[in-house]
């Protein structure tokens, strides 16, 4: 039986040292039994592979009519979204015969040269824009970037693709950040894998010495964490 996209992505996260199990304190103050470090995708091989995973998820979503095929550009919020947008656009072209643009924003507006807030494929009225980002905690980056996109042109945001959905309640709602963004903006938010899929996949994996990758303690703490904070 072929491994699922989520299972293969979990293997990739582990091989890239982007997924760690242990004791971590998040920005929210929550004590988490796992941590995802997007900064681990720090060379050409890893970022190319990551882009291919995003492209595969996008292709699946197109087949299921979750997002349209006629995407004009992939947009990544600065700074972490920049390599995601570029590598995803390359992978869509190389592996899925889709030629799409890539666009990202500047943190500060440029008043000389090409100028403006945006870099890459220019945004024009009527364009279909697909957002890409790594892990959503509260949806802050999305809420900041949507007004910038709309100020640039009357574009249609057709969706957002994340690497991992943490599936956690936000501080002021029982909704997850993903569901809150979907409800607020009306476009689908997809992920290559969600945290439950990651733990299910990791629970079946073994270390090189044959011992389980996830200790019984980590599995118990993961279950307790999702029981308390899961949405």
Swiss-Prot record:
InterPro entries: OPRT, Or_phspho_trans_dom, PRibTrfase_dom, PRTase-like
Record keywords, A-Z: Glycosyltransferase, Magnesium, Pyrimidine biosynthesis, Transferase
Keyword Cytoplasm: no
UniProt-recorded Gene Ontology molecular function terms: magnesium ion binding; orotate phosphoribosyltransferase activity
Family: Belongs to the purine/pyrimidine phosphoribosyltransferase family. PyrE subfamily.
Protein's job: Catalyzes the transfer of a ribosyl phosphate group from 5-phosphoribose 1-diphosphate to orotate, leading to the formation of orotidine monophosphate (OMP).
PANTHER family on file: OROTATE PHOSPHORIBOSYLTRANSFERASE 1-RELATED
Protein name per Swiss-Prot or TrEMBL: Orotate phosphoribosyltransferase
Organism: Bifidobacterium longum subsp. infantis (strain ATCC 15697 / DSM 20088 / JCM 1222 / NCTC 11817 / S12)
Protein encoded by which gene: pyrE
């Amino acid at each position: 039986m072929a491994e699922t996209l989520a299972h293969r992505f979990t293997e990739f996260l582990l091989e890239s040292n982007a997924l760690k199990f242990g004791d971590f304190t998040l920005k929210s103050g929550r004590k988490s039994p796992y941590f995802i470090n997007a900064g681990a995708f720090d060379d050409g091989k890893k970022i190319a592979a990551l882009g291919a995973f995003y492209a595969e998820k996008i292709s699946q979503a197109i087949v299921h009519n979750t997002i349209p095929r006629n995407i004009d550009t992939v947009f990544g919020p600065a700074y972490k979204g920049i390599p995601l947008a570029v590598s995803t656009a390359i992978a869509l072209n190389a592996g899925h015969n889709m030629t799409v643009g890539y666009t990202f924003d500047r943190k500060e507006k440029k008043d000389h040269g090409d100028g403006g807030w945006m870099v890459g494929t220019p945004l024009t009225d009527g364009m279909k824009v697909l957002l890409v980002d790594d892990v959503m905690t509260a949806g802050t980056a999305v809420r900041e970037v949507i007004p910038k996109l709309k100020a640039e042109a009357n574009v249609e945001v057709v969706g957002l693709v994340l690497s991992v959905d943490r599936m956690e309640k936000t501080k002021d709602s029982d909704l997850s950040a993903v569901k809150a963004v979907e409800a607020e903006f009306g476009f689908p938010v997809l992920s290559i894998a969600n945290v439950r899929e990651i733990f299910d996949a990791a629970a079946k994996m073994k270390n090189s010495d044959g011992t389980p990758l996830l200790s019984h303690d980590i599995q118990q703490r993961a279950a307790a964490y999702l029981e308390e904070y899961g949405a």
